[in-house]
């Protein structure tokens, strides 16, 4: 926006993982050994503070981001101490973590009445949640970009690129699990596969505005939003391709598990389900940057289930590459050529 770049966004929107997501921003407890990934996730969490501040300065509503803290539950509660120490050691470079504490049932009951299924849990006040659909809508509106909501293809021309009959000097392909469908016709092999994710939304007659996110072990998360809305999910289905059908049986199974932690959900009204398609690479690492043999073509994919944590920061970096700005991360740590090959 500041660099006076003329931007057009093509967004088909069908199956988009971000829109279907209730994202948890809390990367500090991850035990992934991939240092480049952790740096991206840590700075991605920090970046929300900047993003929210910038939007607020422009008078734009930032309700998509709520910092209400997170609860981490472990089947073996001895592991909580280990995770507490890990987060404590990371707090120096990530003060956003905020207050860290191992809480008892009694202490939790004051913050999140009715939560059960544990003796102790780990709490970090800096954890946040993001409403994916609202985030995408807010960013598109704030960007002032022209938005064309249709499925398009990319053609290489002598002078640059063509999309839907219009010519462009530079193109960013942030097309998630669909990256291969755009690049394969141009002769590339793309190491990105789809993963289906589903979640269910509930409405409770309760004030849930300040409830922390609940993260038990496994796939289940319970994510309270404002005014009694609670999301539960999400599934991680690797064999379903780009399927977008709601699987009630699978969500009912997850709900049964959720009820062991939060029986109150039995009183809630189900207000909808969401389905989206995440993008994964074969080694679960994201990649972003310029396509080595094509000037002016930039890509990003493979963000997986941490996409709401890392996505905005990757988007900022791609914009910096387009306008020749300074970067905070080294693109060599997220090498495009490892996943997109001729």
Which role does the model predict for each range below?
Residues 128, 146-162:
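A conserved short coil-to-beta-strand element within the FAD-binding core of flavoproteins
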Residues 1-3, 12, 23-24, 61-64, ...:
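Active-site substrate-recognition segment that forms the wall
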Residues 8:
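Conserved beta-strand positions in the Rossmann-like core of class I SAM-dependent methyltransferases
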Residues 61-74, 89-140, 235-240, 295, ...:
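Helix-loop-beta segment of a Rossmann-like dinucleotide-binding subdomain
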Residues 264-342:
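C-terminal catalytic lobe of FAD-dependent flavoproteins
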Residues 24-107, 111, 257-259:
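Dinucleotide-binding Rossmann-like beta1-alpha1 core, especially the glycine-rich loop
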Residues 39-43, 73-82, 122-138, 245-250, ...:
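Short beta-strand to alpha-helix junction loop
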Residues 162-170:
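Core beta-strand elements of the Rossmann-like FAD/NAD(P) dinucleotide-binding domain
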